[in-house]
Amino acid sequence: MYFLGDVHAESPLMRDFLNSEEKYCLQLGDFGFIFKYNDWKWNRFLNHFEKNYPNKMIFTVLGNHENYDSIEKMPVKNMFGARCRKIRSNVYAVERGEILSIEGLNILCIGGADSIDKAWRQDGISWWTQEKISDTDVKKTVEKGLTCSFDMVCSHAMPAFFMLQNFTPCFQTGSEFSLEKIYCDIENNGGHIPLWIGGHVHNSIDMMYNDTLFRSLNIGEKIIYHKNDSIEDKFLIH
């Protein structure tokens, strides 16, 4: 399984996946290829990928720099056990609180984040209110985490304690606390999260918290991980 950090619609950041032997990519938000409706740049990559790589698939958990109004109009499909929005026949956005069961991995997905630059953006044009992780998203994700088996969490943003350890408080924008609540509610009620990975912060950082390994991926950073691989070997920064 090919895990990929933020892309921001920069198609060159997808090349390694296209040239790899991996069939599936899980992209960790700020995918960015659905931003301006029918924009030629974004559609060019998506159409090229659909036509020329029919045996590969991209899944994204979505971030904050996405056009949620357009994405919410896309058809809903069940893919590998998860409710997804169909962007192309081989490109899907995984909805929040869904478990994607693929390549032997059960991945609990929770996209979304708050934009720190939204004051300079325009609602419905370059910023969308749906980016924020809602209380309903938190409840659904916790319920899935406590009732279903999973191997890891994939998010866009990272929990508040991760941010406070590694960044100044000005980067606390809201959704980090929702993610912290998800972590605590699962861990304090009999569940366990061995691995949590995300993007958003544009830095490669690893951190152990209790018995969970947290790992943020930089822009365009990749990690290839399979079911029987060592978490520490693959996700710790050596």
Predicted features and spans:
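Active-site-proximal loop/helix segment associated with metal-binding centers of metalloenzymes
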Residues: 103-174
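Active-site environment of divalent metal-dependent phosphoester hydrolases
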Residues: 8-14, 32-36, 62-72, 99-100, ...
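Well-ordered, non-membrane alpha-helical segments in soluble/globular domains
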Residues: 39-47, 135-141, 173-181
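Beta-strand-turn-beta hairpins that frame and shape the catalytic cleft
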Residues: 1-2, 98-109, 152, 208-214
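Structural motif
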Residues: 3, 25-28, 152-156, 197
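Conserved beta-sheet core of the metallophosphoesterase superfamily
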Residues: 57-61, 85-89, 161-236
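Core catalytic region of metal-dependent phosphoesterases/phosphodiesterases
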Residues: 4, 9-102, 172-173, 217
